[in-house]
């Protein structure tokens, strides 16, 4: 039998998941059913992925509806901690970091934040922590941006760094959420998803983002 893991059932009631799987199986012809038996785990993974997509689409739509009727509002209450305990720290110190040691970064992240930190208007930056330790945008998904940057003029920038291979649906969803957060948070708050060269819609390449940050 084809079954869906408890992770999917956490999103939908088990009966709804079972009904969806039944509809999928009923839509298959004899040849496809035989193929499903031979490639059981492939079909299972495809069904799980589809359920995840439907769940995320429903959550995004419901989230937008709640915003439209003023049921969701932003409040400025999150604060930087006096000290942090990253799981792993970055191996080098980059100027203007908020803490003596910041969390681990990959080469692209380190390259970008080092360049941004060199801008004269940047007051400090912080490598945001994940897994309930750092700041996250609480929307139709929980999004932990890579960096928090504060300028000398009081502007707060959330920066999400992406490699060229990460132009997927998850990136697009984070752009929608990040831009919505920035529009609701007020003029001082910005969200940039940044690619080294070729950005997807709603994001920026690095030079464009850096030029914007230079003027904030």
Feature map (PLM): residue ranges:
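Intrinsically disordered, low-complexity, repeat-rich regions
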Residues: 3-143, 150-155, 162-216
